[in-house]
Amino acid sequence: MNCPHYQTQTCISCRWLETPYADQLTQKQTHLQQQISILDQSRLEWIPPFQSAQSGFRNKAKMVVNGTVERPILGIINERNQPADLTDCPLYPARFAEIFSVLKDFIGRAGLVPYNIAKQKGELKYILLTESRANQTLMLRFVLRSETKLPLMRRELAGLSTKIPDLAVVTANIQPQHAAILEGQKEIFLTEQQVLEERFNGIPLFIRPQGFFQTNPAVAEGLYGTAQNWVKNLPVQRLWDLFCGVGGFGLHCAAALQANTPDVALTGIEISPSAIYSAALSAEKCGLKNVSFQSLDAANFALNQDDKPDLVIVNPPRRGIGKPLAEFLNNLRPQFLLYSSCNAVTMGSDLQSLTHYQMRKIRLFDMFPHTAHYEVLTLLTLK
């Protein structure tokens, strides 16, 4: 991938950019192997890594806003502590550059003065732009210091929608603190539509403001599709999807299992109410029965259940599932575990704690090309 920003060192976020892509995959695979090297791999099948496109793969741009209201700069504060314009970043869909040009004009028309950190003055802190690969519609979020400019934004919104016809969801997020915090709790919708629909392997998934959603949709689709293929023929009647987010894993697995056994039951648990709303909407759109999603802490939910599932899916944050939940799963003894991780180091530690389980399949997913980060999926069975 050719990147002028990396060549001039104005942005070095893609730290592996000079490493050939095949070598990137080899290094990541080696790192993954090191994390599980002391575990029993006698029955483990290694599936070849799921590769990513090397450019244009991100569906979301998070832009720090600097400069002036007449000449805003959308991008990052780089390691030289300078604002860098990244509107033509090659990780984004090609059309984002043109959209950002329109947004710069909107910033001026709505009087959205970029927030000045040193002076603690101004209004506009970030612009967040997300695209649905399924239908090319867009979600646009303005992170503001206050609600002062909302009347002007509403006045100019019709003109913005004319220039960007795919604009489906527009919000103002209010983040009043003078701190390096991306977003505040208050989200004000400026459009009637409040969710962006994405579709992976025929399963509709919904993106909401403040909800987590994978930023590499092609690889995310591969991740969910692999999970679906691994479990579709397993003898599963009940499954839990802990840390379920918008329901990607649970819905893919439940849809495949219910195709063979209609009364398969899914329970999804996620601490974010916004994500649970999206997951429930997806289940309804899919026409799936015996599905429930609850807004709870996943570990606490599991520790307080009496019924026993046949399959437990865990997709924890970077810290992993931790010893209490691992020990609970050892004692609960579901026949199958499906573990998805964005941090192979903590996953390796968790798998050491899951002493009653043995890895059967594993696959690396290159969700973040040109960096050291990756996702991994492994299927475990009860010993």
Swiss-Prot record:
Residues annotated for S-adenosyl-L-methionine binding in this entry: Q214, F243, E270, N315
Family matches, as InterPro entries: 23SrRNA_MeTrfase_RlmC, MeTrfase_TrmA_AS, MeTrfase_TrmA_CS, SAM-dependent_MTases_sf, U5_MeTrfase_fam
Q: Where are the transmembrane segments?
A: none
Which Pfam family, giving just one, matches this sequence?
Answer: tRNA_U5-meth_tr
The entry lists its GO molecular-function terms as:
4 iron, 4 sulfur cluster binding; iron ion binding; rRNA (uridine-C5-)-methyltransferase activity
Please indicate if the UniProt record lists 4Fe-4S as a keyword. yes
Which CDD domains does the entry mention?
AdoMet_MTases (cd02440)
Q: Name one GO biological process term.
A: rRNA base methylation
Its EC number(s): 2.1.1.189
SUPFAM superfamilies per UniProt? S-adenosyl-L-methionine-dependent methyltransferases (SSF53335)
* Similarity comment text for this entry: Belongs to the class I-like SAM-binding methyltransferase superfamily. RNA M5U methyltransferase family. RlmC subfamily.
Which terms are listed as keywords in the entry?
4Fe-4S, Iron, Iron-sulfur, Metal-binding, Methyltransferase, rRNA processing, S-adenosyl-L-methionine, Transferase
* Purpose of the protein: Catalyzes the formation of 5-methyl-uridine at position 747 (m5U747) in 23S rRNA.
Could you tell me what this protein is called?
23S rRNA (uracil(747)-C(5))-methyltransferase RlmC
Q: Catalyses which reaction?
A: uridine(747) in 23S rRNA + S-adenosyl-L-methionine = 5-methyluridine(747) in 23S rRNA + S-adenosyl-L-homocysteine + H(+)
